[in-house]
Amino acid sequence: TLLGPARTQIRAKVPVIAVSAVRTGCGKSQTARYLSGLLKRKGKRVAVIRHPMPYGDLARQAVQRFATRADLDAAACTVEEREEYEPHLACGNVVFAGVDYQRIVAAAEAEADLILWDGGNNDFPFVRPDLHIVLVDPLRPGHETSHHPGEAVLRMADVVIVAKSDAAKAEDVRRVAEAAQA
């Protein structure tokens, strides 16, 4: 039996906004950083939880907290991890990651009024969102309904953002918007 998010997501004690996408490269992390800025300007303490990247010593990486580049150095983060974490740090965000999801959520809750899930690899959030924002990409029309888990993520969305609409053909923007409404 393959368990889905309804049975596996962790419930947080603080509100959670999840930002996901139907495919990698949709602009999810940029959107998450934009939202974190809006929330912080409204006086909210935001903790970012980044989709885990289980490279290396998983026991040592059970719960990770990054507030500075020195934290990344101390954790011997990979190039791939740095590419995801450094832009958040540059925005003043504290990033939590790792593989012990329950402890990660508890650590983030202790520091924040709100958790912002910055998903990765077009996967489900491991923490249950109160608001789930999903990006679709009109430069790749049809991918929102032809790839897993992207299509399932789209079906879970509370809000859909058609990203890159300024660079796409109007017909492709219409097509992905219609797919999102179906």
Ranges and model annotations:
Residues 4-6, 23, 121:
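Short, well-ordered turn and helix-capping elements at secondary-structure junctions
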Residues 1-18:
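Short, basic phosphate-binding NTP loop
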Residues 17-21, 30-33, 37-181:
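Flexible phosphate-sensing "switch/lid" loops adjacent to ATP/NTP-binding sites
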Residues 26-27:
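Conserved glycine(s) of the Walker
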